[in-house]
C-alpha cells in the first residue's frame, strides 16, 4: 500500500495536546485535516500513510476566533480535526512523523 501525493494534502498534521494524548489509551489518534476532506478520504489517507487499519473517523470543525490586530478586525481560519479510531493491535506514533 503506497501513499499517493494527495494523501499528504488531506492529513495536515497530528494534534498533540493533553486531550489528544489521553485518547491514545482508547486507540484513537487526532489529526488536523484539510477543511474539505471527507471521512472516507481521511480513512483512506491514514490507512495508506501509516499502514494501519482504521475502524472509525469522527470529524469536528473549530470555528476561527474573531480578533482585532492594530485596530483592524479579522478572523482566524476554521480548523477541521479528525479523531481516527484504530483497529486492535494497530498504533501510530505521531512524535516520529512520516
Curated annotation (Swiss-Prot):
Q: Name one GO cellular component term.
A: ribonucleoprotein complex
> A Pfam family name for this chain?
Ribosomal_L23
**PROSITE patterns to which the protein is assigned, alphabetical:** RIBOSOMAL_L23
GO terms under biological process: translation
Supply the HAMAP family for this chain. Answer: Ribosomal_uL23_B
Role of this protein: One of the early assembly proteins it binds 23S rRNA. One of the proteins that surrounds the polypeptide exit tunnel on the outside of the ribosome. Forms the main docking site for trigger factor binding to the ribosome.
Name of the protein described by the UniProt record: Large ribosomal subunit protein uL23
- Identify the species of origin: Methylobacterium radiotolerans (strain ATCC 27329 / DSM 1819 / JCM 2831 / NBRC 15690 / NCIMB 10815 / 0-1)
Phylogenetic lineage: Bacteria, Pseudomonadati, Pseudomonadota, Alphaproteobacteria, Hyphomicrobiales
Amino acid at each position: 500500500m503506497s501513499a499517493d501525493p494527495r494523501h499528504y494534502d488531506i492529513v495536515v498534521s497530528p494534534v498533540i495536546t493533553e486531550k489528544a494524548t489521553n485518547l491514545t489509551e482508547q486507540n484513537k489518534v487526532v489529526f488536523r485535516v484539510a477543511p474539505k476532506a471527507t471521512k472516507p478520504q481521511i480513512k483512506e489517507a491514514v490507512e495508506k500513510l501509516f499502514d494501519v487499519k482504521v475502524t472509525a473517523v469522527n470529524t469536528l470543525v473549530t470555528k476561527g476566533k474573531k480578533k482585532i490586530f492594530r485596530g483592524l478586525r479579522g478572523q482566524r481560519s476554521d480548523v477541521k480535526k479528525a479523531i481516527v479510531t484504530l483497529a486492535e493491535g494497530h498504533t501510530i506514533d505521531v512524535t516520529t512523523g512520516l
